[in-house]
A protein has these predicted regions:
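Sensor-1/coupling segment of RecA-like P-loop NTPase cores
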Residues: 100-142
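A short hydrophobic beta-strand->loop->alpha-helix junction that borders the nucleotide-binding pocket
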Residues: 2-9, 119-120, 143-144
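Conserved Walker-type P-loop NTP-binding/catalytic site
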Residues: 13-84, 130-133, 152-153, 193-194, ...
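Short coil/turn linkers that connect adjacent helices within long alpha-helical scaffolds
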Residues: 310-311, 326, 346-347, 362-366, ...
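Extended alpha-helical scaffolding segments used for macromolecular assembly and cargo binding
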Residues: 259-263, 271, 275-278, 294-387, ...
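Short secondary-structure boundary elements
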Residues: 18, 143, 150-354, 358-361, ...
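Internal alpha-solenoid helical repeat scaffolds
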Residues: 255-256, 349, 353, 357, ...
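Helix-turn-helix DNA-binding segment
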Residues: 765, 807, 813-898
Length: 898
């Protein structure tokens, strides 16, 4: 049983350490390595002394990496035998430990693990505590008070078998049946020599609950002075105190400390075993509150210095300093800043913010105040604190050095835009920082320019201001520093959106990727920009390699955010290819990873692509539900990332027969896209989609105009998928012989493209047009090929249409018989493919950031649908489908880098 404590609340992962350190310390080297293997290694720095094993630089990721690692440490411990995690006084637990418990209880299914926690009923309203207590599988026990009869039994056991009934009733009335108060009341009565007779009932009432505290102090006052000094030291230091630390604070030698500890144990004040701890928090409170306020504060200040001199963890020192008043002490501010850095390295952002706020109150030396404000604002950004921007603004005002101002502006600008939606201010901040930078800071300058360009292409009010800078940026090619690579990637993405010729954009993107700097944690959106350019230029294999590299890095560092973002973008690439099952699996994985790890995706984009994928698979109702999760009905989400969402909702409305509404969404998408400099139809083919909607509404001339514009823009860009899609739409709008020629051109353009679904559409539309033109024999071949490709992609509505068109030509195509493989959900298919490659359930779970139980459920379902009994049969069962040959997720299992 481990226990929370008032002082320990300031110590990140205090409960976690209490729970796991004994098991790890008692394990031999081989078993310890086994316990901390795989994803559990992400938790190792908590127990290895060096808080910065993986560096401070991955602060945003470290919280989730630590939670993920602790979950797998728990799973590893439970492999040999069932595991019980018991915590008393959970309401006093530190917040990182509470966050971990909430994370754990949602993933316990299938693990032989029992979590038992005790807390005060009224404390359960705290959101983190409520997350644990209100879990659907939690069994909440609320023990009633002891009955009067039960109190009588305890009185007779403690004082005398002949205790008077009236005396026992008085004990019950004085304590209300609270077990702790009964225990302490009886100890107080025994220490005062009160006999349990009827005439002493009034004495019981006089002592009462408050008398319990007085009793502890009375017992303490009767002990030697050394015992009082040691009790005060342990009360100051908190529970589980090492004798050396308590002795140093009490100014006692070790022998005197041992004697005093034994004396306190006999007096039922301290526990008899080491480390030193009170028998109950109420006893500690009695000792602690018996000290004068000035004495308590002086004790905490001395304890902090004593712990620091003894090499204690920075957080232990900080826990003491948090109980002191500001005095302008440099040691205090420096110690709190150090503790904040270490807390951030493990994702304990709440604690880091508290430390830095207290450091600011100290206050630090004037020349360091700007640094503390910067550190505080950065920490608050990670915890979504509302004061983050204000603290970064204050830091910026106090800084004289233009380089420091530049780094602060970079942090503030990104935060204003991504968290606050304040693009105008973000642009002002970044532009001013760039103007102030000296010429010998090219790396920082290019990082600032890259951030500025990234913001501008997403915000209509900021974009016109950015246009004035673009020519100058192009005139001075970025260098090979990280900032240069980031700027090169941002320029490539901007020009690709603008519809510039494909070749120079791809060249820029590939140059930005050279050397691998963009895969680093500081590269921001750099690798995303490169991936987008490659994917929308139809270099889907190259884009896939970018995403695979990021996924491997995300697994190696436990970065759920990078894992989710790379899964989103890889899912997008799968969608563009037409691999709809893979696209759905990745997109759902991205969304689930974000939601289950405590942060929202924040963008409608993954929901939009998932809805598009579901529509192509014929699941309109599910697609509508996905979009409603972003904005129900006709609402518009309050985010800058509206374009993909608008397009997806427009396509859904058209498929639902609400063509006019769908057209309005597409036209609004086009208006917004152009306001952001967007002209490339590879990213948003709104013109061709609007043209087909206009055709359906009988507005052929406007449809022709939009279709012709898209052909021109697609030719300018030069990627087959975009041009093929534009030609197909124009062919449908034109009709007749010219329409047939355009559809034939679309098929030819797409013939060697990786965009299989778009090729299937073009083939089906060409065949259908030939059938309508009474050229049935010529219609059959494109329709057969369209049907085969649509089946391969999993595009059921398109396959059904191609099948119906083939029947109309007089052909007799065989209906596709759905095999067990076709019945697998995308998630089941993904897990089955990984298992077929030899990965264990644990390997798969760690790679996908899910639990082993989730993998077991997916595999069991897959076995049933495939008609097999074990994973040994998976390779043969999956190889039976051409759809899976050469595919699947090639996952190189990664462990935390050292």
């Amino acid at each position: 049983m481990r226990r929370g404590g008032e002082l320990e609340r300031e110590f990140p992962y205090g409960i976690v350490r209490q729970l796991f350190e004994p098991a790890l310390a008692g394990a031999d080297r081989a078993y310890r390595d086994e316990l901390l293997s795989g994803a559990a290694a992400f938790a190792a720095p908590l127990f290895c002394g060096d808080y910065l094993v993986r560096g401070e630089s991955r602060k945003a990721e470290s919280a989730f990496a630590t939670l993920h690692g602790l979950f797998w440490l728990t799973a590893n411990l439970s492999e040999r035998r069932p595991l019980v995690l018991a915590v008393d006084d959970l309401h006093w637990a530190d917040r990182p430990s509470l966050r971990w418990l909430g994370y754990l209880v949602r993933r316990l299914e299938g693990l032989p693990v029992l979590v038992v926690a005790c807390l005060r009923p009224k404390e359960a309203e705290d959101p983190l505590l409520a997350e644990v207590v209100s879990d659907p599988f939690a069994l909440v026990l609320r023990p009633p008070p002891l009955t009067e009869a039960a109190v009588g039994v305890l009185v007779r056991e403690a004082l005398s078998p002949d205790a008077d009934a009236g005396f026992c009733a008085a004990c019950f009335a004085a304590t209300g049946g609270n077990p702790l108060l009964v225990r302490e009341l009886l100890a107080a009565l025994a220490s005062q020599g009160v006999s349990p007779t009827a005439d002493k009932a009034a004495t019981v009432r006089q002592i009462g609950p408050e008398g319990v505290l007085r009793s502890v102090r009375l017992r303490l006052s009767r002990l030697p002075p050394e015992a009082g000094l040691l009790a005060s030291s342990v009360a100051i230091l908190g529970n589980d105190v090492e004798p050396h630390a308590a002795a140093a604070l009490a100014a006692l030698d070790l022998q005197a400390t041992a004697h005093a500890a034994a004396t306190l144990a006999r007096a039922d004040i301290l526990r008899p075993e080491l480390p030193l701890a009170f028998v109950h928090p109420v006893v500690r409170a009695a000792v602690y509150n018996g000290l004068a306020p000035a004495e308590r504060e002086r004790g905490h200040a001395m304890a902090a210095r004593t712990l620091a001199e003894r090499g204690a963890a920075a957080e232990q020192v900080a826990a003491q300093l948090m109980r002191t008043s500001p005095r302008g002490d440099r040691f205090v501010a420096a110690s709190l800043r150090d503790a904040a850095r270490r807390a951030l390295a493990h994702g304990a952002g709440d604690n880091a913010v508290a430390y830095l706020r207290r450091a600011l109150e100290e206050p630090p030396p004037r020349r360091e105040r700007a640094d503390v404000l910067y550190e505080l604002g950065s920490a608050e950004r990670l915890t979504l604190g509302p004061a983050a921007a204000d603290h970064l603004r204050q830091a910026l005002v106090l800084m004289d050095d233009p380089v420091r101002r530049g780094w602060t502006a970079l942090e503030l600008g990104r935060m204003l835009f991504w968290s606050g939606g304040l693009a105008d201010e973000a642009v002002d901040v970044l532009e001013k920082a760039i103007a102030e930078l000296p010429p010998d800071e090219p790396d920082l300058r290019q990082r600032l320019e890259a951030a500025l360009l990234t913001i501008a292409v997403e915000e209509p009010r900021a974009y016109p201001r950015m246009l004035q800078r673009l020519e100058r940026l192009r005139a001075h090619p970025p260098d090979t520093s990280l900032g240069g690579r980031m700027l090169l990637a941002a320029l490539a993405y901007h020009d690709a959106r603008a519809g510039a010729p494909l070749s120079p954009c791809v060249a820029r993107a590939e140059s930005a990727l050279a050397g691998g700097l963009l895969y680093g944690h500081e590269a921001g959106m750099g690798w995303c920009h490169v991936g987008f350019v490659l994917a929308y230029s139809d270099r889907l294999d190259a884009a896939g390699r970018v995403y695979e590299t990021v996924l491997a890095d995300a697994r190696a560092h436990g970065s759920v955010f990078a894992f989710a973002l790379a899964s989103l973008l890889r899912g997008t690439a799968f969608y563009l290819r037409g691999s709809l099952a893979d696209a759905e699996a990745d997109l759902r994985l991205a969304i689930d990873a974000c939601e289950s790890h405590g942060f929202a995706v924040g963008l409608p984009t993954p929901f939009a692509f998932l809805a598009d994928t579901l529509m192509e698979r014929g699941e309109l109702r599910t697609a509508a539900g996905v979009l409603d999760r972003v904005a129900a009905g006709d609402e518009v989400p309050k985010t800058v990332h509206l374009l993909s969402f608008r397009g997806s909702r427009g396509r859904l409305r058209i498929r639902q027969g609400r063509t006019r509404e769908g057209l309005a969404e597409l036209l609004e998408l086009g208006r917004r896209y152009e306001a952001l400099g967007g002209r490339n139809p590879a990213m948003h083919a709104w013109r061709s989609e609007a043209a087909l909607a206009l055709l359906e509404l009988g507005e052929r001339e406007e449809a022709r105009r939009l279709a012709a514009q898209e052909i021109e823009l697609a030719r300018q860009w030069g990627a087959p998928r975009a041009l093929g899609k534009a030609l197909r739409a124009a062919g449908l709008v034109e009709g007749g012989q010219r329409g047939l020629a355009l559809l034939h051109d679309a098929v030819e353009v797409l013939e060697d493209s990786a965009a299989l679904l778009e090729r299937a559409r073009a083939l089906t539309d060409l065949g259908a047009a030939r059938r309508r033109a009474n050229r049935r024999a010529e219609a059959r071949e494109p329709l057969r090929r369209g049907l085969e490709l649509a089946d391969h992609c999993g595009a059921r509505p398109l396959a059904e249409r191609a099948h119906a068109e083939l029947l109309a030509t007089g052909a007799r195509p065989r209906r596709r018989v759905l095999s067990g493989l076709d019945a697998l959900t995308p998630s089941e298919r993904r897990v089955a493919l990984m298992a077929a490659e030899g990965m264990t359930n644990r390997d798969i779970a760690q790679a996908l950031f899910v639990t082993s139980r989730t993998v077991e459920v997916h595999l069991s379902s897959a076995y049933r649908k495939l008609g097999i009994g074990s994973r040994l049969q998976l390779p043969r069962a999956l190889a039976a489908s051409p759809e899976t040959r050469g595919e699947g997720e090639r996952v190189a299992l990664a462990t935390p880098s050292s």
